[in-house]
A protein has these predicted regions:
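Short beta-strand-to-loop acidic/aromatic patch adjacent to the donor-nucleotide binding site
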Residues: 98-110
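Acceptor/aglycone-binding surface of glycosyltransferases and processive sugar-polymer synthases
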Residues: 76-92, 101, 113-192, 196, ...
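Short, well-formed alpha-helical segments that are part of the catalytic scaffolds
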Residues: 23-38
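Acidic helix N-cap motif at the loop->helix transition within catalytic regions
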Residues: 26-30, 54-63
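Short beta-strand/loop segment that forms part of the nucleotide-sugar
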Residues: 19, 42-52, 74-76
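A conserved acidic beta->alpha catalytic loop
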Residues: 49-58, 109
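Hydrophobic helical membrane-anchoring modules
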Residues: 1-15, 190-290
Length: 290
């Protein structure tokens, strides 16, 4: 286990960035992360090794040794996917470090950690917002490099997500997000229900927290100045095809199933639970009659 909690009781650390890593041995921007860590001792970098099959863990351990005061490594024994890596990393940092804000960032640094820090500092000016999320809005003065060939699919998905959330967010899928510390247990205690759209699921959980009509008063979008799509960070076509079904699944889980839930918390569509309850009722009736 390469977990270091020596700084959990210091007052130097203010922010925590979780960085999920899977097979990043040859891709991790090592020098960029190290430069940022050494320049910003107030920021904790927690790298989550998501059961990598290469030497990612050794690379991360080496990075930690170069800046042990604000770099830690959380090793997952097996690959659980980005959503689970982020979830476990967020809970680990929440439980072991006293920070003001926690969030995550992609290992490829499509969004630079310096801009993540700008988001965090901007968030402190608006304490009424529970979360601040990066938004890759193409506009004058911004350097946002996205694959134009994916724009049609992305726009269709974005419209579907807007319908699901019933809110006019510009970008739910950006890998840079930051949350107030008190929201972490509510957002990350339970595993995510979909592997591809956990960002959307975070918004749905925020919606549960703030309410459908007041979600936009609890979440702040931050237009990024720089964002660059990096190599194979793009969603594969076969995964893109699965997204509509994943959205339907989330719609059912978060919006529909609640309307068909019993007082004991079971869904009316849970056949196995319904059979169990029926058998229990029959036994009780038989005991009463005989």
């Amino acid at each position: 286990m390469s977990i270091n909690t020596t700084n959990s009781e210091t007052n130097e650390l203010l922010y925590g960035i979780i960085v999920p890593c899977y097979n990043e041995e040859k891709r991790l921007p090592y020098a960029d992360f190290l430069k940022f860590a050494q320049a910003h001792p107030e920021v904790l970098l927690c790298f989550v090794n998501d059961g990598s099959k290469d030497n990612t863990l050794a690379v991360l351990n080496g990075l930690q040794l170069e800046s042990p005061s604000n770099i830690c490594v959380y090793p997952m024994p097996q690959n659980g996917g980005k959503a689970e890596a982020v979830r476990q990393g967020m809970l680990y940092v929440y439980q072991n470090f006293n920070l003001k804000l926690l969030g995550f960032l992609d290992a490829d640094l499509a969004t630079k950690p310096e801009e993540w820090l700008q988001m965090a500092e901007y968030k402190l000016k608006f304490p009424r917002f529970g979360a601040i999320v990066g938004s890759r809005i193409q506009r004058l003065g911004a350097d946002i490099n996205r694959d134009e060939n994916r724009s049609l699919v992305s726009n269709i998905i974005k419209k579907c997500i807007r319908i699901l959330l019933k809110a006019s967010f510009q970008d739910t899928q950006c890998g840079a997000k930051i949350f107030q510390k008190n929201l972490i247990p509510f957002l990350f205690s339970q595993p995510f229900k979909t592997p591809w759209l956990f960002d959307v699921e975070i918004f749905l959980r925020l919606q549960q927290k703030f309410g459908k009509t007041t979600l936009q008063k609890g979440v702040l979008e931050f237009p990024l100045m720089h964002w660059t799509e990096v190599g194979d960070s793009r969603l594969k076509l076969r995964d893109t095809i699965k997204i509509p079904m994943q959205l339907l699944k989330l719609h059912y889980q978060y919006n529909i199933s609640k309307k068909f839930t019993t007082k004991t918390g079971h869904s009316l569509f849970d056949a196995q639970n319904n059979i169990t309850n029926l058998k229990k009722s029959m036994r009780q009736a038989a005991a009463f009659l005989f």
